[in-house]
UniProtKB/Swiss-Prot annotation:
Record-given protein name: Calcium-binding protein K
Organism whose genome encodes this protein: Dictyostelium discoideum
Listed GO MF terms: calcium ion binding
Gene Ontology biological process terms from the UniProt entry: regulation of signal transduction
SMART domains named in the record: EFh
Keywords: Calcium, Metal-binding, Repeat
Positions bound to Ca(2+) 1: 73, 75, 77, 84
PROSITE patterns in alphabetical order: EF_HAND_1, EF_HAND_2
Length: 192
C-alpha cells in the first residue's frame, strides 16, 4: 500500500481543487488502503481499479475501464496512488459537469487525436445506450440522446470528427444526455 499517504501540502492542494473536506480526504485515504490492499502491492493495480469501478459502472466494457485507468494513472507508472484515486473519485462524482464531459471525451478519444472519429463515437453511443437501459430509459431514447449530440450539425469538420470543444458544447446542452451518463449534480449512482 506504499503510495497511500498524502503530505499536508498535497491534502491542502486537493481540498482547494475539490469539494472534499479534510474529513472526506481522511476517509478516502482509509478506503484507498482497504481497496488497494488485495494484491499486497503499492497502490491500486489496474485489476483493483477495474474491480472497484466496475461495480459502479457495470455497463462499461473492459476496454473502457482500462482506458479510464490509463487516464487516471497520471504519472504512467501502472499504479494508481492515493492522490490519483482521490482525483478519479472527485472527477466522477463531484466535479463540474463540463470537467466530467471533458474527461468523458478523453476516455473515448482512444487515439488522442483531439477528435472523436466514427469508431470512437460508436463506442460512446454503445456506452450511453447501456447506461440508459440500466436507468430504465428505452433503447430508442438512449440512442436518440447519444446521437443527438454527435450528429453532423455539431461537427465543423466531418472528415476529422467531433472535436473536444464541439463535444463538450453539444453534450452540455443536452440535459437528457447528461442524465443518462450520470453527470448531473445528484448522481444516479453512488461512486463513493
Amino acid at each position: 500500500m506504499g503510495n497511500s499517504k498524502l503530505s499536508k501540502e498535497e491534502k491542502e492542494e486537493i481540498i482547494k481543487k475539490t469539494k472534499y473536506t479534510p474529513e472526506d480526504i481522511e476517509q478516502l485515504i482509509k478506503d484507498f488502503k482497504v481497496a488497494a490492499a488485495s494484491d499486497k502491492k503499492s497502490g491500486f493495480s489496474q485489476e483493483e481499479f477495474i474491480k472497484f469501478f466496475k461495480v459502479r459502472f457495470s455497463n462499461w466494457d473492459e476496454a473502457s475501464m482500462v482506458r479510464m485507468f490509463t487516464l487516471f494513472d497520471s504519472d504512467g507508472n501502472g499504479v494508481i496512488d492515493v492522490k490519483e484515486f482521490i482525483t478519479a473519485l472527485y472527477l466522477m462524482a463531484k466535479a463540474p459537469t463540463l470537467d466530467k464531459l471533458g474527461f468523458f471525451f478523453d476516455l473515448f478519444d482512444s487515439d488522442k487525436s483531439g477528435y472523436l472519429e466514427r469508431e470512437e463515437v460508436d463506442k460512446l453511443v454503445n456506452i450511453v445506450v447501456c447506461c440508459g437501459k440500466g436507468l430504465g430509459y428505452s433503447i430508442n431514447d438512449a440512442i436518440d440522446y447519444a446521437v443527438s449530440i454527435t450528429s453532423c450539425r455539431h461537427i465543423a469538420d466531418y472528415q476529422k470528427g467531433m472535436s473536444r470543444e464541439e463535444f463538450i458544447k453539444s453534450a452540455s446542452q443536452s440535459e437528457n444526455f447528461v442524465k443518462v451518463i450520470c453527470f448531473y449534480e445528484s448522481p444516479c449512482m453512488q461512486l463513493y
